[in-house]
Amino acid sequence: MAEQETPQFNIELPEEVGQGQYANLAVVLHSQSEFILDFVRLLPGQQSARVHSRQILTPDNAKRLVRLLEQHLACFEQ
């Protein structure tokens, strides 16, 4: 069986996105066709929080994200 090649492509990272957004809480919702990840900043002593980023993924991409996070967490813990 021939080895599958990973497609190569360029990824552009705009400066305002590259600075990132701090989040200390994540909320996950899902439907039959998508996973929604809301990243929230919850400040101490506050009764409300604000979603700072929402990412919408297909189930396949959500599975890929889980695998990547597991790999990186394993490396981090070594």
Model-derived features with residue positions:
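N-terminal intrinsically disordered, cationic/polar leader segments
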Residues: 1-60, 67-78
